[in-house]
């Protein structure tokens, strides 16, 4: 469906590496395969040879040579200029748990917010799940007016593994509005902004 589109952007601060500025485009699949070989505390070192045009990924005794993609064939994501009416910041573990609970009942989750609370709700054919956070339980809450929007858990649930280890996740949305999720990890070395289009009644 056209309303299921999603976008991601990640920024890694230059304090995490030593290099001369260059632009390299890689297939995420290949990086994921390499990362999967390591333990949580392992480091991957990347070295790019401009003469050969080959990037070497080193993990312990493993060296993998990767041929980068042609940058001219890559279209960078266009971040939408959206005016979000509501913003909520909460602990990553709490948000992760609410998504996992929601998935036990259905495929679509409703986020609703007003000046006093943020609610995660799923209504299934026989069961329902509601997770409510009062403003005092949230790290921050900004809301001009009550808003509600529905999103697919197909895209949200895989992120719950990431959210569980985060100190905070910032959500921004409005009535039947795209969802923006912003978070940082590794002590702020990397910042991610993820956009997910809403599911509206005409989609169902």
Language model features: what each stretch is:
Residues 1-12:
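Single conserved hydrophobic/aromatic residue that forms the stacking wall/gate
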Residues 56-58, 112, 121-123, 172, ...:
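Beta-strand residues in well-ordered beta-sheet regions across diverse protein folds
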Residues 118-120, 178-204:
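Short terminal or interdomain "cap/linker" segment that borders an active site or interface and mediates
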Residues 50-83:
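Internal, conserved structured core segments that host functional sites
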Residues 10-14, 67-74, 134-138, 197-201:
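A short, sequence-level motif marking secondary-structure junctions
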Residues 117, 124-126, 133:
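Short helix-loop boundary/capping segments
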Residues 13, 62-64, 125-129, 186-190:
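Short, surface-exposed beta-strand-loop junctions and turns on beta-sheet-rich folds
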Residues 13-49, 79-114, 119, 135-176, ...:
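DNA replication sliding-clamp ring fold and its partner-interaction surfaces
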